[in-house]
Amino acid sequence: MCCIAGAPSLSGRERAEKEGIRFKENKGELKIGIINLMPFKEEVEYQFYAVLGRFDISVEVEFLYPENHVFKNTDGSYIKDNYYPLGELNNRNYDAIIMTGAPVELLDFQKVNYWDEIKNLIKSNKLPALYICWGAQAALYVKYGIEKFTLNEKLLGIFRHRTNKNPFVSGEFWAPHSRNTQNSSKDIKNAGLRILAESDEAGVYMASDRDYREFYISGHGEYQRERLKYEYSRDQNLFPKNYFPEDDPKKEPPMKWDSHRKEFYYKWLSHIREKKFSNISDKR
């Protein structure tokens, strides 16, 4: 079993439970399926357990993986014991899905070895969805034909965003970004999507369809405090902007984006819960 440097050798769930975060084994108010495309599975699991488990909304979480990909950094037996194949998604009775980013953004979509699985999922999905980073770029490409383009330099750091009036994010907030590619705001607007939050330096952070059913998020509100510190120590060639106090890597970075992610994920879960139970009432 592998996880990123500095992280304990525990599953994401075990690590969250050790810190007092509890999840429903079954029959939570909401059931969320997370398509985890990142190489270090346990770290991403923990990120989402920590984010989704902090509210007074009981959530059951399951993780899924594309069958056409062999993950090099996680033992196959761990995947088999803790994940469902993507082909099972429609049989799991989810209320919503989340698709993570993936370290394949510099590849053409068609050259990603699990692209057909991802493309078919996005095309057929009828559930509320959060698409994050590469997952957002993939969904925008499949659904609207929006191309991604490569940045001159990797975007790494914490950036300030402004919001356009909407029920999910408000005011100005900080959020992490870590990516080499981007979508243009012009293309997103021309597709008829809502731009909910954006940054002069980091571009569009969050967009949605007109009904707030699908969200496209270019950054990483789910990141824990140390994630960009790990990326900096790994790469060394790029310093994360607005992250370390006084740009000193020896100082503990503040969690400047915590209030933003708390607001968004609480409102998103509440929105899904409201829609779910209003649909149940309508059927009675």
Swiss-Prot record:
This is Homoserine O-acetyltransferase 2. The record marks E105 as: Important for acyl-CoA specificity. The active site is at C133 (acyl-thioester intermediate), H220 (proton acceptor), E222. GO terms for molecular function: homoserine O-acetyltransferase activity; homoserine O-succinyltransferase activity. It comes from the Bacteria. SUPFAM superfamilies: Class I glutamine amidotransferase-like (SSF52317). Pfam families: HTS. It is an enzyme of class 2 (transferase). It is found in: Cytoplasm. Its main location: cytoplasm. Substrate binds at K154, S178, R234. The lineage of its organism: Bacteria, Fusobacteriati, Fusobacteriota, Fusobacteriia, Fusobacteriales. Its EC number is 2.3.1.31. The keyword Acyltransferase applies. Belongs to the MetA family. It catalyses: L-homoserine + acetyl-CoA = O-acetyl-L-homoserine + CoA. Keywords: Acyltransferase, Amino-acid biosynthesis, Cytoplasm, Methionine biosynthesis, Plasmid, Transferase. One of its GO terms (biological process) is methionine biosynthetic process. Transfers an acetyl group from acetyl-CoA to L-homoserine, forming acetyl-L-homoserine. GO terms for cellular component: cytoplasm.
